[in-house]
Amino acid sequence: MPEQHPPITETTTGAASNGCPVVGHMKYPVEGGGNQDWWPNRLNLKVLHQNPAVADPMGAAFDYAAEVATIDVDALTRDIEEVMTTSQPWWPADYGHYGPLFIRMAWHAAGTYRIHDGRGGAGGGMQRFAPLNSWPDNASLDKARRLLWPVKKKYGKKLSWADLIVFAGNCALESMGFKTFGFGFGRVDQWEPDEVYWGKEATWLGDERYSGKRDLENPLAAVQMGLIYVNPEGPNGNPDPMAAAVDIRETFRRMAMNDVETAALIVGGHTFGKTHGAGPADLVGPEPEAAPLEQMGLGWKSSYGTGTGKDAITSGIEVVWTNTPTKWDNSFLEILYGYEWELTKSPAGAWQYTAKDGAGAGTIPDPFGGPGRSPTMLATDLSLRVDPIYERITRRWLEHPEELADEFAKAWYKLIHRDMGPVARYLGPLVPKQTLLWQDPVPAVSHDLVGEAEIASLKSQILASGLTVSQLVSTAWAAASSFRGSDKRGGANGGRIRLQPQVGWEVNDPDGDLRKVIRTLEEIQESFNSAAPGNIKVSFADLVVLGGCAAIEKAAKAAGHNITVPFTPGRTDASQEQTDVESFAVLEPKADGFRNYLGKGNPLPAEYMLLDKANLLTLSAPEMTVLVGGLRVLGANYKRLPLGVFTEASESLTNDFFVNLLDMGITWEPSPADDGTYQGKDGSGKVKWTGSRVDLVFGSNSELRALVEVYGADDAQPKFVQDFVAAWDKVMNLDRFDVR
């Protein structure tokens, strides 16, 4: 569908002809205008302050886990079933059942997930907000959510939209005869859209995300702006099933699905319902975010016929896949392989395939009792038949439908839970007992935890082991900072810092200190566990974090502060067999400004990548600032590089980073090595410090400099230590869903 309003354009330099960087006129802040209009390339620190507490109408004391636990899930299922099977005149149900629509709604909510940064997915209920609520691929899903309002209204705070959207899809499958694998509640609603990079394109269905032969830009997964997966008409509307198979494989891979899971999801999902392309697409009105006020948040209002029911237009494709569109069976594959196919067009002018030579005419039921139809398929459906790998998989299912049911159940379960993180976050009576490899399992605690006396003893042993403050802090940070708040993966729990692939990540300097630290901590663990009384044990994962805490206490003492860094035991150690190496590989940081590491192939300069990392760690701007300053003086840099170590007292927890960054006696200039680093020279012209773009941005950016001035003041040292320890403790426990 063409964009209703052309995007604002800029000149190549970002400045208008009169020297002003804004084209057109400035907008009021309430219209979205502001500093970013004047300086488009400035750091957007708002990405660190998303969904603030003041925006949450439920209040700080609200406990969603406690509320959702009170729901009678059987009664909820019946309520959703009633909605699904009660057609509404304002949006009539195809075949009298909204189940297929709800499956699409759930699929498209969860299907925005992508592996490279873990963003997207159903958590937070983001489908309610722009841009997702107005993506072309989500046309008419605004109606699906409105249909569910009576259910949401009834359960109120006990049931989030995020859970309801996905659970409705699960219920739809069950309602139409399919046995699902299970379901976990626990998705908490957010109250504003996430700031997520969905692509560089400024028009719907743009595809500037490709380079080379057909290399898709990271971290994106969908093929075009505004699509969830692939273009159902084929690549850029080219109805070539073999070419479409290439897009399908790459796109689904980037959403964590292998070939079997991909085929199962397509076959299973297209066993139900239909697409909608009853008439010309240019008769469809604007998406929800561009629709007139009086449409009350609904979009895509069509002037073709009644605009609904038999006249509905969504994708523009008019396909009914099976002769039993509200029943689980094997008819999709039977029809896919039972006919030869010819290229045709829908009434809306979209490419699709129809059974050749009129075969099967009249065998497909009309959704509203009209004459029977001919079998039809999408170009991407035929990909399952023409691609050799997909063909081998799906032909077997043609003869073994029970295998299809099993694979679809598991793939659907993965699809709708992939962004939820560990099973400790899954709530409710429908959670399966089985934990799957993609859920990054960690063993349950099977021993007594260490207490204060044991913790004190272990700290002493660690500090007496010969390991330095730098080594201990770096290792603990490397383990814990692998966490991603987007999909709740990574973190210190599991002790995977010593397993593949993490132990070999370049950012962890695998040929440097890491293996020595691992070996030493393992020796301490073995010695302690063999001598500890009763069933008291300590895990390697706990020792990694405890080592960092002990090192910080030592560094604080060196700076004149006697502190205790919080430590919460209870982490356990995963095995290599419990760790999917390929799946974990996408967690490898390509940049970590906290360690002054910048790998190759990053899309933005280092300071922007720092913000992205801080966002994934759910840090605020003050937390990010205090952590960078503290980690620099503790010597936690990648390969112990001197960049940003603005202190003469390394491994001492001082505020020297901030004090020296603000020193007006230092003049900064790019390094003659032309390697992206900078030299800070004193009045004599002597190089006193070296720094990276990440370091200097804290003095250059006005908002970050304001924070630096807090920690660089003469009275700031106690506050700096306090705030650093609090931020450190937060990062160390980001993955501890077992205790929060």
Curated annotation (Swiss-Prot):
Catalyzed reactions: H2O2 + AH2 = A + 2 H2O; 2 H2O2 = O2 + 2 H2O
Positions annotated to bind heme b:
H270
Enzyme class, top EC level, equals oxidoreductase
Entry's Gene Ontology BP terms:
cellular response to hydrogen peroxide; hydrogen peroxide catabolic process
Q: What is its EC number?
A: 1.11.1.21
- Top-level taxon of origin: Bacteria
Catalytic-site annotation from UniProt: H108 (proton acceptor)
Positions bearing the Tryptophyl-tyrosyl-methioninium (Tyr-Met) (with W-107) cross-link: Y229-M255
Tryptophyl-tyrosyl-methioninium (Trp-Tyr) (with M-255) crosslink residues? W107-Y229
Alphabetically ordered keywords of this record = Heme, Hydrogen peroxide, Iron, Metal-binding, Oxidoreductase, Peroxidase
Q: Where is this site: Transition state stabilizer?
A: R104
**What role does it play?**
Bifunctional enzyme with both catalase and broad-spectrum peroxidase activity. May play a role in the intracellular survival of mycobacteria.
PANTHER family, A to Z: CATALASE-PEROXIDASE, HYDROPEROXIDASE I, BIFUNCTIONAL CATALASE-PEROXIDASE
UniProt protein name: Catalase-peroxidase
